[in-house]
Amino acid sequence: MIQGIQITKAANDELLNSIWLLDSEKNEARCVAAASTYEADQVIAISDLGDYESREVAIETAPRIEGGQHLNVNVLKRETLEDAVAHPENYPQLTIRVSGYAVRFNSLTPEQQRDVIARTFTESL
């Protein structure tokens, strides 16, 4: 786990008010900012900090962006949609979800209807 700290008291005066990221898994300290001696991004062993007192500094990470995820749930049988293609007059109220919107199946073009059927009913995930 990584923790941010600002050193408020230390045996080594060069550490006073410096800001560090402590990685407890690697036992490493990464300097974020220091007045002297230490440089930004310098990595040292946590034990090299010696005796110190500190206050926690909140660390904010950017959200992970995984890309769009979308699920349309239509509770229908394949045969129902295929019959609606062949006999649209029997299904004037048949409504489905497409890209988050409710749409009447009969208002779609034949190409869109085939696409909905192909994407809705698959053999495996």
Swiss-Prot record:
Gene3D superfamilies (UniProt xref): 3.20.70.20
Keyword annotations: Organic radical
InterPro entries, per the entry: Auton_GlycylRad_Cofactor (IPR050244), Form_AcTrfase_GR_CS (IPR019777), Gly_radical (IPR001150), Glycyl_radical_cofactor_GrcA (IPR011140)
Record has DNA-binding as a keyword: no
Keyword Iron-sulfur annotated: no
Xref: SUPFAM superfamilies: PFL-like glycyl radical enzymes
Domain Glycine radical: 5-125
Function: Acts as a radical domain for damaged PFL and possibly other radical proteins.
Protein name: Autonomous glycyl radical cofactor
Lineage of producing organism: Bacteria, Pseudomonadati, Pseudomonadota, Gammaproteobacteria, Vibrionales
